[in-house]
Amino acid sequence: MAGRGSRLRPHTLTVPKPLIPVAGKPIVHRLVSDIAKVLGEPIEEVAFILGDPAFFGDDVVESLMELADELGAKGSIYRQDKPLGTGHAIMSAKDSLSGPAVIAYADTLIRADFDLDKSADSVIWVKQVERPEAYGVVKLNGNNEIVELVEKPKEFVSDLAVIGIYYFKDVGVLKNQLQHVLDNDITHGGEYQINDGIKRMMQKGMKFVPGKVDEWMDCGNKNVTVETNQRMLSFLEKEGESMIADSVQQENANIVEPCFIGENVVLKNTTVGPFVSVGANTVIENSTIKNSLIQSDSKISNANLDNAMIGNHVVYNGNFETISIGDYSVLE
């Protein structure tokens, strides 16, 4: 979680990307909960690797510790002082690297329903994609085992893209290999990468297999985050999840589902939806809103929004359709 999420600015100027709500729940909260479902067993510890305390401060730590507590797990916080790559980030948490573990990048969302092969030394989670040349992919042998990781292949290797989630039967083995990477200064563009540790494990004959997820959703920028919100709302609706709080106040309002409407939201002379998420305590008046995310404690008036993303504590009175407004902004 140590990155700054620059492609999602202005929203990540005040809130780290993994804590931005999608369909009413922070990205990292959804991710960890969905991983827990696949594991199908109690989680003992959740370790979070954060960057500069000036950006990932006490409020971030509090939210993450609450997430660990919800899972009945111990929460641990580690700091990556410099952005020196995924391998370096993982080794920042080396005190927690023992036994079975999942390592995941915190800014992605999944839907997965597969049986985790815990007999393998590692399971690399993958998604079948249409343009494999744009991703890092896995190469399989005839036994459905991963024998190579290939970054953005120019010639077809496979269409199974690595999504940044890994299960290790004993993550201590990865730790030992990454320690070798750091000790020998094996870098790419000045960064230490998890792939070099994985490749060393493969060279030692360890068994890697793919775990195929059903859906893989990105939150890299505003447009894809809005799209991810749409997809997540659709999934939650199909699963029968209740997404409209009982405390919502409506006056001449219409909600076109699927939508997430948080606690104590006020809707007056307004149509909301489909595919809209509204955070708690937000007031929306005289507006039509679809395909958009609006966070908490904001006031929206006289708006006609489509494909919009509005942060927390925003006052907005206007008619730009596809606007993106960060926290604590006033546009009247």
Feature annotation, model-predicted:
Residues 7, 13, 20-21, 25-103, ...:
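Conserved N-terminal catalytic core of the sugar/cofactor nucleotidyltransferase
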